[in-house]
């Protein structure tokens, strides 16, 4: 099995048509006027939409290969930096910070999540906006009674 998190070109190919979060993120970015910070920016899937608004964009990620791909795609139009979303220290604050595509769930412990949120707090302007995009499933879909068969549906 191929790990798409080690192959940024493959990751981009698989996710090229994902845009379910674009409208909300661009609306909030435009409303705040930037600058914009994306955590777990990966290859910069959403950077294009922010840049198209004429806003300053910074993306952080912990993957060197994904950051290299993002820098190759956007050159000096955007800033991409190697940082862990749990503990990052940048020289500026942002009017809009977001973490999309369920990436907040890479914070595997409460401590990880708390550190991430503290780092966001440290970099968000006083009237800034922070968005976390997470899929929250219906609990009834996750719970299955033991020793009970469930019909298959298509």
Where are these predicted regions, by residue range?
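A short glycine-rich, Lys/Arg-flanked "PGG" loop and its adjoining helix->strand segment in the class I
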Residues: 114-126
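Class I SAM-dependent methyltransferase "Motif I" SAM/SAH-binding loop
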Residues: 40-42
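A short acidic, Gly/Pro-enriched loop at the edge of an enzyme's catalytic core
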Residues: 89-96
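A conserved beta-strand element that flanks and buttresses the S-adenosyl-L-methionine
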Residues: 98-100
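Conserved class I S-adenosyl-L-methionine
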Residues: 1-34, 131-154
């Amino acid at each position: 099995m191929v790990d798409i998190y080690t192959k940024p070109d493959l990751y981009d190919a698989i996710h090229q048509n994902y845009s379910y979060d674009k409208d909300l993120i661009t609306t909030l970015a435009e409303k705040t006027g930037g600058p914009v910070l994306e955590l777990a920016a990966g290859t910069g899937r959403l950077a294009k939409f922010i840049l198209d608004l004429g806003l300053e964009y910074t993306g952080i990620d912990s993957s060197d290969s994904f950051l290299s791909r993002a820098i190759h795609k956007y050159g000096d139009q955007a800033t991409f930096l190697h940082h862990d979303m749990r503990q990052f220290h940048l020289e500026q604050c942002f009017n809009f910070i977001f973490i999309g595509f369920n990436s907040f769930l890479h914070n595997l412990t409460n401590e990880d999540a708390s550190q991430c949120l503290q780092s966001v707090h440290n970099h968000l302007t006083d009237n800034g906006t922070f968005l976390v995009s997470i899929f929250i499933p219906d609990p009834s879909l996750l719970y299955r009674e033991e020793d009970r068969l469930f019909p298959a549906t298509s």
